[in-house]
Structure formats: C-alpha cells, structure tokens
Amino acid sequence: MGNVQERPSETIDRERKRLVETLQADSGLLLDALVARGVLTGPEYEALDALPDAERRVRRLLLLVQSKGEAACQELLRCAQQTVRMPDPAWDWQHVGPGYRNRSYDPSCPGHWTPEAPSSGTTCPELPRASEQEEVGGPEGSEALQPRTPEEPELEAEATEGDEPDLEQEMNPEQEPEPEPEPEPEPEPEPEPEPEPEPEPEPEPEPEPDFQEEDESEDS
C-alpha cells in the first residue's frame, strides 16, 4: 500500500496547538485574508473579530473552518502560511532583491486604484521640469521669474534719494566744503573783589599843656 496523502482537516487536527500559538499575534490579518478569499462571511468575520481574547478567536476560527469542508481547511492553511512567513519582502526594503523594484505591477482587482507605470513620464503640471530649469538658467533664472513685491520700488526710490548727494559731490570735486564757524570763546568769570582792610584806629590826641596855669605861676 502506498502512502496516503493527509487531508487538510487532519493537518489542522494534528497541528492545532502550534497553529493556535502561532496565529494569535496575526489573527486579525488571517481573518482579513479568509474574508477576501470567500472562506468567511461578513457576519462570521465580525463575530470572530469582536472576541477580545486572541487565543479564543483562533480556536473558534479553526473549528468554524473545519466545519466548512476540506477546501476551506486548505485555504486556511495557505493563508496561515502566507500570514506568518510573509514571503513578499515589501515590508522590509533592506532585504529586497535587485529584481523586486523593477517588477511589473500585478493586475488589480476591479474597483481598486491602479498605480501608473513608472515609464509613463507624467509629471506634476505645477512643477517645472529639469530641462525647463536649465533653459531658464538654474537658480538665477528662477529668481528672475519671481514676481517683485510692491515694497521693492519704494526701497529703490529711497536708495536713489540717498545716493543723490554723493553723486553731486563726485561731479563737483573742486568745490570745497564750507568751513564750520568756530565756536565763540566763553567769557572768563570776573575775579571777586578783595575785601578792604579795616582802618586802623586813630591815636587819641595828647592833652595840651595848660599855659594859663604856667603864667599864673610865673606872676606869683
């Protein structure tokens, strides 16, 4: 007798513990994949997604899928393998191979946004192309294309008014500037008068001798 191939439901029974432990972290992504493949219906998805416990959510999911038949179990195992291993390196650009960036876009589902091909050559109409910038003359040309603000003419007018006296001096270099008037000297303060010395007291006159008394003495 040859080896009999194991059915998907038997694989789930054998690896139930490992599946529950492995799929707890990514149970939400697994539910999304099963809904997209038509394994789960909308009400079933909402009922499982509302469970707060991740372990309980995965256990209920395995039982529900096993009740749907071998085809549903096979889709579950395929989605679980893709969810856990993540073979597409789109989320890790450090390990992207050389051909991944140049791969062609896969046909999208109807109703979804389709990215434009890299070779379309469409550019934003508001941004100038590199060739247009070279024709203008690089950054200098871009400055020349910028509109001037109304404040610039006023600044230029003030600058021309301030330069007129300098131009007149350059045109008449022989004209000497007028000498500035010398400041008048301040008057010197008058010296204060010296105080007059006090007059010395006059000596009292000596009394004159009484000549009459002398005459009387001589007569006697």
UniProtKB/Swiss-Prot annotation:
Pfam family, one: CARD
InterPro entries according to UniProt: Apoptosis_Repressor_CARD, CARD, DEATH-like_dom_sf
Membrane topology: Lipid-anchor
Post-translational modification: Phosphorylation at Thr-149 is required for its antiapoptotic effect by blocking death-inducing signaling complex death-inducing signaling complex (DISC) activity through the control of interaction with CASP8. Phosphorylation at Thr-149 results in translocation to mitochondria and this translocation enables the binding to CASP8. Dephosphorylated at Thr-149 by calcineurin; doesn't inhibit the association between FADD and CASP8 and the consequent apoptosis. Polyubiquitinated by MDM2; promoting proteasomal-dependent degradation in response to apoptotic stimuli.
Limits of the CARD domain: 4-95
Lipidation sites (N-myristoyl glycine): G2
Coiled coil start-end: none
Compartments, record wording: Cytoplasm; Mitochondrion; Sarcoplasmic reticulum; Membrane
GO biological process: blood vessel remodeling; cardiac muscle cell apoptotic process; intrinsic apoptotic signaling pathway; mRNA splice site recognition; negative regulation of apoptotic process; negative regulation of cardiac muscle cell apoptotic process; negative regulation of extrinsic apoptotic signaling pathway; negative regulation of hypoxia-induced intrinsic apoptotic signaling pathway
Record PTM Phosphothreonine, positions in chain: T149
Stretches with biased composition (Acidic residues): 152-220
Disruption phenotype: Mice homozygous for the NOL3-null allele are born normally and externally indistinguishable from littermates of other genotypes. NOL3-null mice grew to adulthood without any abnormalities in their general health and appearance under resting conditions. Under biomechanical stress, NOL3-deficient mice develop accelerated cardiomyopathy which is characterized by reduced contractile function, cardiac enlargement, and myocardial fibrosis. Likewise, under ischemia/reperfusion injury of NOL3-deficient mice have a markedly increased myocardial infarct sizes.
Principal subcellular localization: cytoplasm
Region described as Disordered: spans on this chain: 111-220
Keywords assigned by UniProt, alphabetized: Calcium, Cytoplasm, Lipoprotein, Membrane, Metal-binding, Mitochondrion, mRNA processing, Myristate, Phosphoprotein, Sarcoplasmic reticulum, Ubl conjugation
Region (Essential for interaction with BAX): 20-70
UniProt keyword annotation of Membrane present: yes
Keyword Ribosomal protein: no
Gene Ontology terms: cellular component: membrane; mitochondrion; nucleolus; sarcoplasm; sarcoplasmic reticulum
GO molecular function, one term: calcium ion binding
Function statement: Apoptosis repressor that blocks multiple modes of cell death. Inhibits extrinsic apoptotic pathways through two different ways. Firstly by interacting with FAS and FADD upon FAS activation blocking death-inducing signaling complex (DISC) assembly. Secondly by interacting with CASP8 in a mitochondria localization- and phosphorylation-dependent manner, limiting the amount of soluble CASP8 available for DISC-mediated activation.
Assembly and oligomerization: Oligomerizes (via CARD doamin). Interacts (via CARD domain) with CASP2; inhibits CASP2 activity in a phosphorylation-dependent manner. Interacts with CASP8; decreases CASP8 activity in a mitochondria localization- and phosphorylation-dependent manner and this interaction is dissociated by calcium. Interacts with TFPT; translocates NOL3 into the nucleus and negatively regulated TFPT-induced cell death.
UniProt remark on domains: CARD is critical for both extrinsic and intrinsic apoptotic pathways. CARD domain mediates a protective effect against myocardial ischemia/reperfusion, oxidative stress and TNF-induced necrosis. The C-terminal domain (amino acids 99 to 220) is involved in calcium binding and plays a protective role in calcium-mediated cell death.
Protein name per its UniProtKB record: Nucleolar protein 3
